[in-house]
């Protein structure tokens, strides 16, 4: 979900990112990054001759970009196919981080290598493929406004019933310090009466409370 600006692309000799969401390929991604670096040092070629940076005017939240389902599954399956071409070192689709308030907040395709034609064509292929399926991405879980979601949770017999605040998700770059949701939850009597609904709220940073 990284946001790659033109400046970052220009000043990064080698760059790569995860190819699975959820990020089950963390180990593979680290290995790929290290192997690319070591290989370039050992063969004496150093920096890649060419870098293709293609901004794609798409902005998607992580909850819509799972690679376990379509279209993400097929889209990301094309990444290693591009990387396997002669003259290509790495290929990546950066979905972008939707909650970042900055100009570089959009998707990007990056391909690096020593063959200009292979790098260019690979980047264009991935960018066009991404654009072609831009309207097919859907939320991987039910979504509702806060009040409707809470009403559904309170009426359900399922335990636990989990609600996620997509806009302040500390596992996806959020600070986790927005208290609005917790404040609204505590207004409900169901969480204050004996024998009422129990609530676990995770999480808001509280260094002083931890120290106590």
Which residues make up each language-model segment?
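Active-site histidine-anchored catalytic micro-motif
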Residues: 1-47, 160-182, 186, 190-206
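General structural feature for long, well-ordered alpha-helical segments within catalytic domains
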Residues: 4, 8-11, 29-37, 71, ...
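Generic local-structure boundary detector
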Residues: 19, 23-27, 86, 90, ...
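Accessory alpha-helical/coil subdomains and C-terminal extensions
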Residues: 45-54, 60-151, 155
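Short, conserved secondary-structure transition motifs
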Residues: 60-62, 202-211
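Short glycine/threonine-rich loop-to-helix capping motif typified by GTGT followed
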Residues: 65-71, 152-154, 170-179, 212
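Structural beta-strand/beta-sheet cores of well-ordered domains, especially the beta-sheet scaffolds
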Residues: 105-109, 159, 195-199, 211
């Amino acid at each position: 979900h990284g946001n790659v600006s033109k400046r970052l692309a220009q000043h990064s000799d080698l760059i790569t990112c995860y190819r699975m969401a959820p990020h089950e390929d963390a180990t593979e991604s680290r290995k790929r990054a290290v192997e690319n670096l070591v290989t370039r040092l050992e063969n004496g070629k150093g920096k890649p001759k060419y870098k293709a940076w293609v901004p794609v005017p798409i902005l998607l939240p992580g909850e819509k970009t799972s690679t376990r389902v379509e279209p993400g599954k097929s889209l990301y399956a094309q990444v290693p196919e591009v990387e396997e071409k002669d003259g290509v070192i790495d290929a990546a689709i950066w979905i972008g981080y939707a909650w970042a308030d900055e100009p570089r907040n959009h998707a990007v395709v990056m391909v690096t290598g020593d063959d200009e034609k292979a790098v260019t064509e690979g980047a264009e292929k991935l960018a066009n493929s991404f654009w072609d399926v831009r309207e097919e991405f859907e939320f991987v879980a039910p979504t509702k406004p806060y009040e409707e979601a809470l009403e559904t949770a309170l009426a359900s017999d399922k335990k636990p019933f989990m609600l996620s605040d997509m806009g302040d998700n500390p596992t996806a770059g959020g600070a986790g310090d927005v208290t609005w949701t917790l404040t609204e939850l505590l207004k409900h009597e169901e969480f204050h009466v004996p024998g009422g609904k129990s609530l676990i709220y995770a999480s808001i940073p509280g260094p002083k409370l931890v120290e106590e």
